[in-house]
Swiss-Prot record:
Its cofactor is Mg(2+); [4Fe-4S] cluster. Binds 1 [4Fe-4S] cluster per subunit. The cluster is chelated by three Cys residues, the fourth Fe has a free coordination site that may bind a sulfur atom transferred from the persulfide of IscS. It is found in: Cytoplasm. The gene is ttcA. A motif (PP-loop motif) lies at residues 47-52. This is tRNA-cytidine(32) 2-sulfurtransferase. SUPFAM superfamilies: Adenine nucleotide alpha hydrolases-like. Keywords: 4Fe-4S, ATP-binding, Cytoplasm, Iron, Iron-sulfur, Magnesium, Metal-binding, Nucleotide-binding, RNA-binding, Transferase, tRNA processing, tRNA-binding.
Length: 311
């Protein structure tokens, strides 16, 4: 009995530590990009996947201790996909006491009518979904729309655009919507997918499968995701370094004439960012930039037992 109790406390300790890290990551992203302001009404887009559940949970947690006041309303779009469990999200949200709205729109039928069998439906489905969510945000008086994309999604998008689109373009943590009326935020921008997965598993969220529509996985994105996971295993810290690079862009050392006035460089111009300082002349840190090794998960149990609740 005592052993089982210790195991439970150890698991609780690890969950608390994980939740604190996610809280810190989300809090830093909110502060860095001014995502949430006093009086904001945040529409939290809830799909039923691990990412959106985690986003809602962390935002609810931060709401209790934040120095500003903001409200949350969870929104799910029921696209009438066959097998969609309509009862799951309402039951979960009512149990939490969270304000919510289920929007019912048969986008599944529209997509099936417009897209030939066997073709990827994601693009059209995404456009339809965006339009409905923007309309819903207006109806609810939401000042911000929160999406559950995380750090890995942002990096994958960067590499997708480099490999297949020929441009350096990621996924912004904060942006103006394409209809020009709504501010979209991604509070999980600094969060690692593996942390989110562990948190979702520990919290036992009622996950709804994401492939109910029967559409094929985006194979290009899957290739990139597999590549990044392989790099993360073989070269610890590389993912952190690449994400850090997205926050430390040096336009004068790229080739985009829209970002830097190369034509304006003449004799007598000042040196910009080290001039022609080649990479092999710079001091390279022994540890990858932005990387912090995780704490040893096998610490002595007695160091863990007194911590049972996140404050």
């Amino acid at each position: 009995m005592q052993e089982n109790q210790q195991i439970t406390k150890k698991e609780q300790y690890n969950l608390n530590k994980l939740q604190k890290r996610l809280r810190r990551n989300v809090g830093e992203a909110i502060a860095d990009f001014n995502m949430i302001e006093e009086g904001d009404r945040i529409m939290v887009c809830l799909s039923g996947g691990k990412d959106s559940y985690t986003m809602l949970e962390i935002l609810r947690n931060l709401q209790q201790s934040a120095p500003i006041n903001f409200s949350l309303v969870a929104v799910n779009l029921d696209q009438k996909q066959p097998g969609f469990p309509e009862h799951v999200l309402p039951e979960y949200l009512e149990k939490l006491g969270v304000e919510y709205k289920i929007v019912e729109e048969n986008t599944y039928g529209i997509v099936k009518e417009k897209i030939p069998e066997g073709k990827t439906t994601c693009s059209l489905c995404s456009r339809l979904r965006r339009g409905i969510l923007y309309r819903t945000a207006t109806e609810l008086g939401a000042t911000k729309i929160a999406l559950g994309h995380h750090r890995d999604d942002i990096l994958q998008t960067l590499f997708l655009n480099m490999f297949y689109g020929g441009k350096m373009k990621g996924m912004p943590p904060k942006l103006m919507s394409d209809d020009g009326k709504h501010i979209v935020i991604r509070p999980l921008a600094y969060c690692r997918e593996k942390d989110i997965q562990r948190f979702a598993d520990a919290k036992a969220f009622p996950i709804i499968p994401c492939n109910l529509c029967g559409s094929q996985t985006n194979l290009q994105r899957q290739v990139i995701a597999d590549m990044l996971r392989d790099w993360d295993k073989r070269y610890p810290g590389r993912i952190e370094t690449m994400f850090s690079a997205m926050q430390n862009v040096v336009p004068s050392h790229l080739c985009d004439t829209n970002l830097f006035d190369f034509k304006g460089i003449t004799h007598g111009s000042e040196v910009v960012n080290g001039g022609d300082l080649a990479f092999d002349r710079e001091e390279i840190p022994l540890q990858p930039a932005g990387w912090q090794p995780e704490e040893d998960e096998n610490q002595l149990d007695e160091l863990r037992l007194n911590v049972v609740e996140v404050k």
